[in-house]
């Protein structure tokens, strides 16, 4: 069993080293990953150097507003709120966009633009919130939530993030919430992928940590997602000199 207290200290030291006195800009949603990452930041650098940004849209649930407020108050932080609807609507209107997934990616990339605005104007670095499960599945938007300067929990499976959340005393309402990327109304990660995070973590750990694999349909699905998203985990294709 991993030593999660030691892992918290390791991540905190990593963040201090990488940020090197710069401000930390982080997008928060009221979800488990951004909540844990925000709490880790408070253990790493002075609170006045942390800039949390909440970027809701018309599909954002009231529970998310409540959880963002609850968490930031608990951590002694002040957050910025920027609604993304006007910007996203402008893109959708200009492009006559109708594809739900493409519009979801526009939302994610709009949030990235906002975070980099605050980083540019506050001498900061953008802190990402992608976990290892999402990384291996490619379950993130290229140049969207995948666009950042440092990824402090990218080596942790979703199950590990929950273990850290317990130690960091993340509010129970956040712990119990169904994970969602919030890209369209009613979307949840597990429904979209078609299996629980516990199943995903077990399969990914079997394949990438233990080197074991079988021909069960769920293994094939996970490996197909990994293969199709390979481009997200690599630099753009280019010719060698």
Curated annotation (Swiss-Prot):
Keywords assigned by UniProt, alphabetized: ATP-binding, Ligase, Magnesium, Metal-binding, NAD, Nucleotide-binding
Superkingdom as given in the UniProt entry: Archaea
NCBIfam families reported for this sequence: nadE, PRK13980.1
Family assignment from sequence similarity: Belongs to the NAD synthetase family.
Annotated positions binding deamido-NAD(+): 109, 142, 149, 231-232
The organism of origin for this protein: Thermoplasma acidophilum (strain ATCC 25905 / DSM 1728 / JCM 9062 / NBRC 15155 / AMRC-C165)
Name this protein carries in UniProt: NH(3)-dependent NAD(+) synthetase
Reaction equation(s) it catalyzes: deamido-NAD(+) + NH4(+) + ATP = AMP + diphosphate + NAD(+) + H(+)
Function recorded in the entry: Catalyzes the ATP-dependent amidation of deamido-NAD to form NAD. Uses ammonia as a nitrogen source.
